[in-house]
């Protein structure tokens, strides 16, 4: 068996294996799943721009710069890279042939912190098919965000148990009177690069319940992680959706966070922002983040829609089947993470089916754009499913837990996560109580 055929065989194990395909229609939740799935495909309903009829709170600005990284992580890699935009384009349908349904249950209603969500018809800004839409939240009635807990950096090297991960709310973004705090761009920028040589980047993200800290928004975290990994100096502004400063409204009228300005130009589409940053912030100065393997961009693509049907369900008799659907989606991701990439295969491992992958992330040992897209959603699923369904990711999914362990050990991920309490509160009205009716 030659090298090419062997590598192809390895990938076919993940791409063509049907063991974990949904054979039970009940796992799709019937009409509920169809309605959720229809909303996932209809990206025009996601992140509808409603700023004209909403108010923002005041904003908090934080300068962010390059964090300490190894020289290896800054070196551009060779080979072909695949941007994830194509797999997540509007033409992408992770489950072709699914019946469509009425739009009574929209994804923004499903995943919004409030029940009375406004639905405007202005141009959408985000085209990720699996993210919840930000909405105009009511005044929250819940606990304050959790205090910082044990950081993932302190985890032991052995395989963690499902309950061993707790995420701390980043101290780096605590605020005092809505002013820059904790560090400045000069403190964290590397080298002696002049300010004039670097682009001026301002990222606007959703604020938490206190109006200042980072809120629950996988879109925002996705862009936050990308900029951090690029090592570019940028400012982060948290925006509370209850009020709006006039200057922010004038900057991006009719636009929800996240969005950014790049040397004064406003950019609002998340996928296009990702593509722009990858094409603009290039080696040798900035690392390349696109995944080398196309399969990495689609790994875990159906997890969030399975989770949405599972958490929205109110019928006790449907719960087990929907839970199996989520578990199968997680298992497919686990299989991909345990399957060696072509570069992990050498003469010593060929023919050894027990020799699995040891890589840290989806596409290798460094975070890529694929991870920036998947990890924020995977974190939400983990927190919310445990809180409202007492569901833990199965301990036997060693690839999945290795992936999470390595992600929680990276500041680029943990310090851009919202507090667990923020995520739980956002889903308080979404997660429905099960009944026997």
Curated annotation (Swiss-Prot):
Question: Basic and acidic residues bias located where?
Answer: 34-45
Describe tissue expression. Answer: Expressed in most tissues. Higher levels found in kidney, heart, skeletal muscle, T84 and PANC-1 cells.
sequence repeat extents: 118-125, 126-133, 134-141, 142-149
Give the EC number(s) under which this enzyme is classified.
Answer: 1.8.-.-
Task: Mark out the compositionally biased spans (Polar residues).
Answer: 1-14, 161-184
The annotated modulation of its activity is: Inhibited by F-actin.
Q: Where is this motif: G-site?
A: 217-220
Q: Which residue range or ranges hold the GST C-terminal domain?
A: 263-427
Give disulfide pairs as residue numbers. Answer: none
Region 4 X 8 AA tandem repeats of [AGQ]-[SP]-D-[PS]-E-E-P-Q, residue ranges? 118-149
Q: Which domain of life is it from?
A: Eukaryota
Which region ranges are annotated with the description Disordered?
1-197
Q: What is its main location?
A: Golgi
**Processing after translation:** Phosphorylated.
Query: What Gene Ontology molecular function terms does this protein carry?
Result: chloride channel activity; oxidoreductase activity
Residue ranges, compositional bias (Acidic residues) = 121-157
The subcellular location is: Golgi apparatus; Cytoplasm, Cytoskeleton, Microtubule organizing center, Centrosome; Cytoplasm, Cytoskeleton; Cytoplasm, Cell cortex
Q: Which SUPFAM superfamilies does this one have?
A: GST C-terminal domain-like (SSF47616), Thioredoxin-like (SSF52833)
Its membrane topology: Single-pass membrane protein
Task: Supply one GO CC term from the record.
Answer: intracellular membrane-bounded organelle
Subunit structure, interactors included: Component of a multimeric complex consisting of several cytoskeletal proteins, including actin, ezrin, alpha-actinin, gelsolin, and IQGAP1. Interacts with AKAP9. Interacts with TPRN. TPRN, CLIC5 and PTPQR form concentric rings at the base of stereocilia and may form a complex. Interacts with EZR, MYO6 and RDX; the proteins may work together as a complex to stabilize linkages between the plasma membrane and subjacent actin cytoskeleton at the stereocilium base.
What the entry says about domains is: The active G-site contains a monothiol Cys-X-X-Ser motif which mediates glutathione-dependent redox catalysis. Members of this family may change from a globular, soluble state to a state where the N-terminal domain is inserted into the membrane and functions as a chloride channel. The redox status of the active cysteine in Cys-X-X-Cys/Ser motif likely determines the capacity to adopt a soluble or membrane-inserted state. A conformation change of the N-terminal domain is thought to expose hydrophobic surfaces that trigger membrane insertion.
Q: What's the stated role of this polypeptide? A: In the soluble state, catalyzes glutaredoxin-like thiol disulfide exchange reactions with reduced glutathione as electron donor. Can insert into membranes and form non-selective ion channels almost equally permeable to Na(+), K(+) and Cl(-). Required for normal hearing. It is necessary for the formation of stereocilia in the inner ear and normal development of the organ of Corti. May play a role in the regulation of transepithelial ion absorption and secretion. Is required for the development and/or maintenance of the proper glomerular endothelial cell and podocyte architecture.
Q: What's the protein name?
A: Chloride intracellular channel protein 5
- Name of encoding gene: CLIC5
